[in-house]
Amino acid sequence: MIVVEADTDIFRVFNLVQHIFDRYEAWEERLWHILRHGANLPQMLEVSRDILSNPMHLIGSDFRYLAVTDEAYFQKDLGIRLDTETFDAEKMATFLSLHDLSTHVHEPLLLELQGARTLSVNVFDQEEYLGCLTVFEAFRPLRDSDRALAVFLVKLLRQAIQQNPVLASTRSA
């Protein structure tokens, strides 16, 4: 809902709303283009970076990194080593002591992870767990709209993984 509280040029309001619409439409078009031309997961996350405005990573069902944005944030701020194929065993043990893996949950999850809030959306092919997209609250607070945006992105990531199941077993970032 858009509320205009003062006398405003209706054409200016229209142009602002149109600009917002154009931004999301261009994002969707870029995602579909990537999906049709190789389904590159790191590219899909990278073009989504401007929309979600926070670091993200995508892991496969075997917990290997498939794609990551803002690697410096993960390495410097969270101490996560991305040069390995999978999570650090000690950090994973700490996480598991505090949280259930939740690989069965279809709804977006807000979690506290290493002192940062995260929004995670699992990727499913019907009931089969394919992986998880996690958006880290680092550069701006998470918004309610991020849930819908992440769910939309996950639907396209699922299609990319389905196009090439090898993507789910090796990190391609």
For the regions a language model picked out, list residue spans one by one:
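Hydrophobic, helix-rich cores of sensory/ligand-binding and other regulatory modules
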Residues: M1-A173
